[in-house]
Amino acid sequence: MKTKTDFLKMKEQGEPITMLTAYDYPSAKLAEEAEVDMILVGDSLGMVVLGYDSTVPVTVEDMIHHTKAVRRGAKETFIVTDMPFMSYHVSLQETMVNARRIVQESGAHALKVEGAGEVISTIQYLTNAGIPVVAHLGLTPQSVGVLGGYKVQGKDAESAKKLIEDAKKCEEAGAIALVLECVPMQLAELISEQLTIPTIGIGAGQKVDGQVLVYHDLISYGVNRVPKFVKQYTSVQEEIVRGISQYVTEVKTRQFPEEKHSFTMKEEECLVLYGGKQ
């Protein structure tokens, strides 16, 4: 399993880091088989697999539950778990309780938190306690209401400079990596050059140290539309619908199950069962 040291070395050597979200045992198992470097159990699971309109309703218990499943499916892959909405915007003591629960109960190797400002002290606090932290800047979904929607961040020089400053503060606080979401590629490149920790981009162009995509977006599974930054490498959704539709048809027309899908009794047992009448 790769560790923080390996990811730093990959950045130094110019080897891109691959990160993929996974929310359950089968997706984690497949991600590990595909040799993904890092798995993110994102609170995006609220929208992707739980059907919420945002990530806000996701709880600490949800994150623990899903991370445990991912851990069972990917025992040899570094796993990062999101701290959900309002689980770390409380006192540092309450934040530690939530962080401890997620790490101890789920088996996550690191936690991810969004934003800067007061979150910087949280990064430092968790790091000092021995919990690796991944920072997240740019479009931060938990704050989408404050940001005015799902929009690209850092498009003007002033806001771009603020993001650069925040990125440096995250590194200084002890973050082991930084996710940059929906920022101009020029800004992402500049931030990547000025940090010693790896940057993982999602909608941040190619000049970052790694990329992350949502599993379901990448394979077109259960999604109707995807953001501009997503490349769909295959479409399992069409095959799944086709297969289920065929199943429905065959059941309705009594083509399924066939004899090869059924179990039988010996003829003499049937005679006993039917009282000698068939």
Swiss-Prot record:
Name its GO BP terms in alphabetical order.
pantothenate biosynthetic process
- Catalytic residues at 181
Q: Where in the cell is it found?
A: Cytoplasm
Q: Which InterPro entries match?
A: Pantoate_hydroxy_MeTrfase (IPR003700), Pyrv/PenolPyrv_kinase-like_dom (IPR015813), Pyrv_kinase-like_dom_sf (IPR040442)
Pfam family, any one: Pantoate_transf
- Annotated residues that bind 3-methyl-2-oxobutanoate are located at 43-44, 82, 112
Alphabetically list the UniProt keywords.
Answer: Cytoplasm, Magnesium, Metal-binding, Pantothenate biosynthesis, Transferase
Broad class of enzyme this protein falls into: transferase
Recorded hits in HAMAP family, A to Z, give:
PanB
Subunit composition and interactions: Homodecamer; pentamer of dimers.
Q: What is this protein called?
A: 3-methyl-2-oxobutanoate hydroxymethyltransferase
Please tell me the species this chain comes from: Bacillus cereus (strain B4264)
